């Protein structure tokens, strides 16, 4: 492990991809109320359980013709309330036409049945890229919200959840679902990724100093150290 003394450091958020601005990534589908095994439920995230909160999900879609790096972006629910935002794993790249699904088991974001909620995706600077909402006491068992054939956001009462695929097609199956990682805050333990900038003393020798250094921290652990001139 590297022993480092960090002086005059500032925290800089990981930059968002320039391609991700302008509402290029969309929230394509969400599931609020997952059915249980007694009523024909499905284990949507493949963790061995049905009908629990871990199967709530938000599905993102890249409708553009270019790959978009959403690493360091955030998923959140209603602004100034609800659950804490989670930070999407660095280097999460969504290819053109690709879907990625984030389950509550990773995000820890609760979709509120009673009061309804707003689900949002934000870039690395906390600028809102897209958002959707649903009313309170409205979600039905295994009935998702998503974009219908007319391109309207609606409760898809004539369909079933399709995490990882198009809303008007049969579900691709859990083995084919690209599941994303999103790190929520956990008490005093930092989860997520950020870069420290400043003068770094590496402690490898008394004169081992990087005047304009960078340190990548992932989940509270130092992953890389380099000079800005590298």
Where are these predicted regions, by residue range?
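Bacterial N-terminal signal peptides
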Residues: 2-11
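Intrinsically disordered, low-complexity linkers and terminal tails enriched in Ser/Thr/Pro/Gly
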Residues: 5-6, 16-187
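N-terminal metal-binding scaffold of metallo-dependent hydrolase/deaminase domains
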Residues: 183-230
């Amino acid at each position: 492990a590297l022993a480092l003394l960090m002086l005059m450091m500032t925290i800089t958020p990981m930059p968002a991809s320039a391609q991700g601005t302008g509402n290029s990534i969309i929230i394509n589908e969400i599931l609020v109320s997952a059915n249980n095994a007694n009523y024909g439920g499905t284990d949507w995230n493949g963790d061995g359980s049905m009908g629990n909160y871990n199967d709530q999900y938000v599905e993102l879609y890249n409708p553009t013709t270019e790959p978009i790096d959403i690493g360091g972006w955030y998923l959140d629910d209603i602004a100034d309330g609800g659950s804490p935002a989670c930070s999407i794993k660095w280097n999460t790249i969504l290819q053109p036409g690709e879907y990625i699904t984030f389950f509550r088991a990773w995000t820890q974001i609760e979709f509120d049945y009673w009061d309804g909620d707003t689900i949002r995706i934000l870039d690395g600077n906390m600028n809102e890229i897209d958002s959707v909402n649903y009313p309170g006491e409205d979600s039905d068992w295994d009935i998702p919200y998503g974009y219908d054939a007319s391109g309207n956001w609606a409760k898809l009462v004539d369909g079933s959840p399709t995490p990882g695929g198009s809303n008007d097609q049969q579900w691709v199956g859990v083995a084919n679902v690209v599941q994303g990682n999103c790190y929520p805050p956990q008490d005093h333990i930092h989860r997520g990724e950020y870069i420290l900038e400043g003068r770094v003393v590496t402690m490898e020798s008394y004169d081992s100093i990087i005047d304009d250094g960078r340190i990548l921290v992932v989940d509270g652990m130092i992953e890389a150290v380099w000079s800005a001139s590298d």
